[in-house]
């Protein structure tokens, strides 16, 4: 019953007209996020190795999601303005003048599912860097973000936070179910398999320590391996805990984050209906 009620609220929210101010706000947030993401990736470009890091892959995909939403919303907005302008009564009636500012979000729910998955992926980037990579960076916590012309800050904080804000504020029309939360764990887990295959079958190594994984929490080549414990080895190359255990913990955290995002999105949908 609760799920049906929420779906009805989300469907009703989808029918609500939007104004030019919301279009401008959406556009600004998405444009800034995309610029920050592209700058951050370009400033830290490493050739093909760039595409072996989850940070860059998640930033690429969130750029696709944000740019796609920007194009789709712009199309809907411009179509609404064009129809209103071409209306026979638009030049004379005040209601027509008001309609110039009204448009509807026409994105499909499948697109929202994709965007939600990419939002969780970029949230993974934000969370893991904040909690594990920045604190163990040789430059220190602040230095980790400010290095290389603040490119790290752009891809690990600015772009992720703006993408999360964009989802919560503007994707309340997304008709979500709990299954979508589990879909959103697919990209991070698929990346783990991708990185392991690069290491095992292509002999790729990462960083000055030639790690067998791009990140210390995935470095199964460290003494802790997949299922061990070696807390005394905690440093920039390992957390001293078996990678398998960390993956279980991370997955549970990401499921929790997904639930929080959907709860905030649903609260936003209810607020829109009340207004």
Q: Which sequence ranges carry the predicted segments?
A:
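Interfacial segments of alpha-helical transmembrane regions
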Residues: 98-121, 177-186
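Membrane-interfacial, low-structure loops and terminal tails that flank and connect transmembrane helices
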Residues: 2-22, 76-110, 265-275
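Hydrophobic alpha-helical membrane-insertion segments
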Residues: 121-122, 182-203
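Membrane-interface loop-to-helix entry segments
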Residues: 149-161
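Alpha-helical transmembrane segments
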Residues: 25-40, 119
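Juxtamembrane "helix-exit" motif on the non-cytosolic side of transmembrane helices
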Residues: 42-48, 131-143, 200
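Membrane-interface transmembrane-helix boundary segments in multi-pass integral membrane proteins
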Residues: 202, 207-262
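Alpha-helical transmembrane segments in multipass membrane proteins, preferentially the mid-helix core
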Residues: 158-176
């Amino acid at each position: 019953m609760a799920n049906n009620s929420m779906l009805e609220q989300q469907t009703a929210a989808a029918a609500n007209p939007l104004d030019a101010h919301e279009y401008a706000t959406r556009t600004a947030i998405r444009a800034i996020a995309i610029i920050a993401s592209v700058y951050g990736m370009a400033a830290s470009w490493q050739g093909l190795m760039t595409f072996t890091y989850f940070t860059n892959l998640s930033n690429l995909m969130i750029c696709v999601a944000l740019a796609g939403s920007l194009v789709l919303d712009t199309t809907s907005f411009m179509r609404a303005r064009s129809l209103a302008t071409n209306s026979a009564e638009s030049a004379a009636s005040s209601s027509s003048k008001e309609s110039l500012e009204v448009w509807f979000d026409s994105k499909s729910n499948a697109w929202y599912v994709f965007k939600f998955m990419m939002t969780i992926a970029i949230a993974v980037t934000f969370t893991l860097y904040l909690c594990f990579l920045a604190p163990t960076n040789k430059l220190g916590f602040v230095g980790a973000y400010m290095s290389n012309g603040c490119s790290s800050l752009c891809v690990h904080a600015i772009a992720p936070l703006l993408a999360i804000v964009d989802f919560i504020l503007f994707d309340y029309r997304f008709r979500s179910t709990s299954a979508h939360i589990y879909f959103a764990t697919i990209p991070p887990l698929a990346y783990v398999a991708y990185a392991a295959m690069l290491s095992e079958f292509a002999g790729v190594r990462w960083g000055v320590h030639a790690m067998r994984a791009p990140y210390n929490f995935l470095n199964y080549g460290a003494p802790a391996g997949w299922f061990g414990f070696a807390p005394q080895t905690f440093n920039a190359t390992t957390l001293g805990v078996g990678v398998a255990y960390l993956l279980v913990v991370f997955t549970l955290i990401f499921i929790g984050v997904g639930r929080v995002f959907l709860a905030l999105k649903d609260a936003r949908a209810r607020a829109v209906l009340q207004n």
